[in-house]
């Protein structure tokens, strides 16, 4: 009849959509490899479902309806929600191979001349030069002094002195295959039937893992005085962790992982109310 509806499952983990021929719609948590045991009187809050509707006479699109709702009720009210900044990010041009202090600062000068408002340091600032950036996540305390001899705060101060904002990239959940963190702290790793995932990651359903992630983010923001942080996630968590020594159930590891991730983001937002947090997943 020309009327339109939009549904979105407000959830970062696995989900399930079923639309019948009769027009009935079922939306929710995937049933595959998911179980959640509740104790007597224990409650479980399920993820939200976003629904937008407009009739054929309306000129505004469904996306416009959704954007207005998110802007009014969901997105934090800070400088980024009012007007996005023009950003320079070193990725794709230099990636992790060619970026270093001299290259970054030279581009900051160009960005300043062009009126760009935000300069972001992407992957490649941690670990050692010989190992690929995707194999060292987790070693966030090990700043690559070969590439950045004066440290990250020096870069941030250089950017701030020119009236621009400083941003930095982080993939906090990822656990690089060759990282020192993975070698020294195996208790935090997400496992499936006792085996590591092809792309290892930290299970946030484990309290130690969650505390570590919060510390990674807050320490990096404080030490660099960052205005903007880009949180990436370049892996598939698949069905999550089913370890029985993590504090979550055997069938709800991924569910608890994302519940805790949202709690961490809320805590970071409370601590740094003006921090701009960008959600990124392999660039998307």
Please give the residue ranges for each predicted region.
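Feature activates predominantly on carbohydrate-active enzymes
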Residues: 4, 11-15, 22-24, 29, ...
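N-terminal small/glycine-rich loop or linker at the start of catalytic domains
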Residues: 77-95, 185-202
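Terminal accessory/anchoring regions of large secretory-pathway or extracellular enzymes
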Residues: 55-86, 96-97, 104-108, 114, ...
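Active-site neighborhood of glycoside hydrolase catalytic domains
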Residues: 143-151, 155-161, 182-284
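Hydrophobic faces of well-ordered beta-strands that scaffold small-molecule active sites
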Residues: 84-90, 117-121, 166-170, 229-231, ...
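Aromatic- and glycine-enriched glycan-recognition loops and surfaces
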Residues: 29, 93-183, 188-190, 211-215, ...
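N-terminal accessory beta-strand-rich subdomains and adjacent acidic, glycine-rich linkers
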Residues: 1-73
